[in-house]
Design a protein with these regions (language model features):
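Substrate-binding/catalytic subdomain of NAD(P)-dependent oxidoreductase enzymes
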Residues: 1-76, 82
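Catalytic, metal-anchored helix/loop core of enzyme active sites in primary metabolism
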Residues: 42, 52-56, 60-126
Length: 126
């Protein structure tokens, strides 16, 4: 709701994928809790929905989390415990991955996976 969880995930991805050394304080965060009733009505009137989107544009040094109005059919509009990520590639264009991202089992699995990745990275000297 406040965007902190999404910002933390953005920091982890940025440091892992682009070998950056960013901190949570480097992310501009606007939580979905800051939305007004007018913004919610506007999205509804346009047959859209509002989702909290974490965005990284490394070549511009942009790291931000903010609510966005998206068409209900947009690939990032997922429900319940699903998370989605869209990666903009040079050769294939946009690629969207969707999977479970919330809940106690999913969180535990992700933590274990992250710890194994970190262990393997240190073992290789990365």
């Amino acid at each position: 709701v406040k965007g902190i969880d999404a910002a933390i995930k953005l920091v982890i991805l940025s440091n892992t994928i682009w070998k950056r050394n960013v901190k949570l304080s480097d992310v501009t965060i606007t939580g979905i809790d800051m939305l007004t009733n007018d913004a919610l009505r506007l999205a509804e009137d346009q047959h859209c929905t509002i989702r909290l989107i974490a965005e990284a544009i490394p070549e511009k040094g942009i790291l931000r989390v903010a609510p966005r109005i998206l068409p209900r059919t947009h690939p990032l509009v997922v429900e319940n415990t699903l998370n989605a990520i869209t990666i903009d590639t040079d050769m294939a264009g946009e690629i969207t991955l969707i999977g479970k991202g919330a809940g106690s089992r999913e969180t535990a699995s992700a933590c274990i996976g992250d710890l194994l990745f970190i262990k393997d990275s240190h073992a290789r000297g990365n």
